[in-house]
């Protein structure tokens, strides 16, 4: 388990913190297909999460997915601990040529739109932590795929770190905590409150 400790904002007490633990399993990188993550940011983030013992999940889209696929392919250590979930066979073949393990994770008979949606849900289901870069620079808003990943993670009580200029609204369902991840990446932790009866996710 990896434990994060984040200052609780708005309390007036610098010592009050929210602590939560995440299995050191898989972190999913996701975000806008038009998004741009600077190469140094992606490299530092991947290196830090690798040191904590995480493996990596990422999708087959351009934009944010593509940046992290490239970063993860640069070292043997991250390459062997990365799985790329694909919506289409053509993408899996192309990505496989980069050295990363890529596989189609949806049935062949579904429509392209449904395939993209089911790929996202498949990846969120298998992640322990979601790192989300949802802002679409063309619209200034979150993309639909990013919103889907965000809500799916919260439905499954999984924490999300969101790098965005449009933070989620406050909610009784989760803590919303501004933070600087690893001391360099500004964003917001969205940490669902525990539910005694378990999660509200279902088989996807």
Tell where the protein language model's regions lie, with residue ranges.
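Glycine- and charge-rich intrinsically disordered segments
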Residues: 1-6, 199
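Leloir-type glycosyltransferase catalytic cores
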Residues: 174-204
């Amino acid at each position: 388990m990896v434990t994060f400790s984040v200052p609780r904002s708005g309390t007036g007490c610098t010592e009050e913190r929210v602590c939560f633990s995440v299995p050191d399993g898989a972190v999913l990188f996701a975000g806008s297909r038009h998004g741009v993550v600077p190469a140094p940011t992606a490299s530092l983030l991947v290196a830090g999460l690798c040191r904590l013992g995480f493996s990596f999940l990422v999708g087959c889209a351009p934009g944010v997915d593509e940046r992290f696929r490239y970063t993860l392919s640069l070292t043997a250590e991250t390459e062997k601990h990365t799985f790329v979930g694909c919506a289409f066979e053509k993408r899996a073949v192309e990505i496989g040529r980069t050295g990363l393990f890529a596989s189609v994770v949806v049935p062949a008979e579904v429509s392209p739109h449904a395939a993209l949606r089911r790929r996202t849900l498949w990846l969120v289901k298998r992640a322990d932590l979601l790192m989300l870069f949802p802002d679409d620079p063309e619209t200034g808003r979150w993309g639909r795929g990013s919103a889907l990943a965000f809500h799916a993670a919260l439905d499954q009580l999984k924490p999300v770190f969101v790098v965005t200029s449009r933070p989620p609204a406050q909610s009784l369902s989760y803590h919303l905590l501004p933070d600087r991840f690893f001391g360099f990446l500004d964003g917001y932790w969205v940490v669902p409150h525990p539910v005694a009866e378990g999660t509200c996710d279902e088989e996807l």
